[in-house]
């Protein structure tokens, strides 16, 4: 508390004599390393003219990890809570594959028996590993479609 008000309000000076390399002194611009606190020639030049560029367009970039995570999560949610009963009813209507009016297992094919332990889960309605893989892959397909169409300049303008 012995500092004066003039010392608190004076501009801060930084020493550029530190030249040792530590992770905090290196930054990157693309793939080119920029030295912070080093020479100012490595930093990009900024123009300070007063003229505005009307051709500059600011666009938000989609983060691939966020898009893939959200799309996969939404797909799993829809598969579990929206389409699950519809899917199970259609599979039950279709039934097992038959040959000459008998199922393959009844016709003597011992390998056609359903592998039950793969389809067991602790989920209350029976959402199992096959469902997770199927709905997760649909979510990934949708995410990659979103990323591919947004990266090539396609703008669907859904809301305006």
From Swiss-Prot:
Keyword field contains Transferase: no
The keyword Membrane belongs to this UniProt entry's keyword annotation: yes
Gene3D superfamilies linked to this entry: Chlorophyll a-b binding protein like
Topological relation to the membrane, as annotated: Multi-pass membrane protein
Gene Ontology biological process terms in this record: photosynthesis; photosynthetic electron transport in photosystem I; photosynthetic NADP+ reduction; photosystem I stabilization; protein stabilization
GO cellular component: chloroplast; chloroplast envelope; chloroplast membrane; chloroplast photosystem I; chloroplast thylakoid; chloroplast thylakoid membrane; nucleus; thylakoid
Superkingdom classification of source: Eukaryota
Broad class of the protein's primary localization: plastid
Keyword tags: Chloroplast, Membrane, Photosynthesis, Photosystem I, Plastid, Transit peptide, Transmembrane, Transmembrane helix
Span of chain positions assigned to the transit peptide in the UniProt entry: 1-60
Subcellular location, record wording: Plastid, Chloroplast membrane
TM ranges: 66-86, 129-149
Listed PANTHER family: PHOTOSYSTEM I REACTION CENTER SUBUNIT V, CHLOROPLASTIC, PHOTOSYSTEM I REACTION CENTER SUBUNIT V, CHLOROPLASTIC-RELATED
Family from the record: Belongs to the PsaG/PsaK family.
Task of the protein: Not yet known.
Annotated protein name in UniProt: Photosystem I reaction center subunit V, chloroplastic
């Amino acid at each position: 508390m012995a500092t004066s008000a003039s010392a608190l309000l004076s501009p801060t000076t930084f020493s550029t004599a530190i030249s040792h390399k530590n992770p905090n002194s290196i930054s990157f611009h693309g793939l080119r390393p920029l030295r912070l606190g080093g020479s100012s020639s490595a930093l990009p030049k900024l123009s300070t003219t007063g003229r505005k560029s009307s051709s500059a367009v600011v666009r938000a970039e989609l983060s691939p990890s966020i898009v893939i995570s959200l799309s996969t999560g939404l797909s799993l949610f829809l598969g579990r809570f929206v389409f699950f009963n519809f899917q199970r009813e259609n599979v039950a209507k279709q039934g097992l594959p038959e040959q000459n009016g008998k199922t393959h297992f009844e016709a003597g094919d011992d390998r056609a028996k359903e592998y039950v332990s793969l389809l067991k889960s602790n989920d209350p309605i029976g959402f199992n590993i096959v469902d997770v893989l199927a709905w997760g892959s649909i979510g990934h397909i949708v995410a990659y479609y979103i990323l591919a169409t947004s990266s090539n300049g396609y703008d669907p303008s859904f809301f305006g």
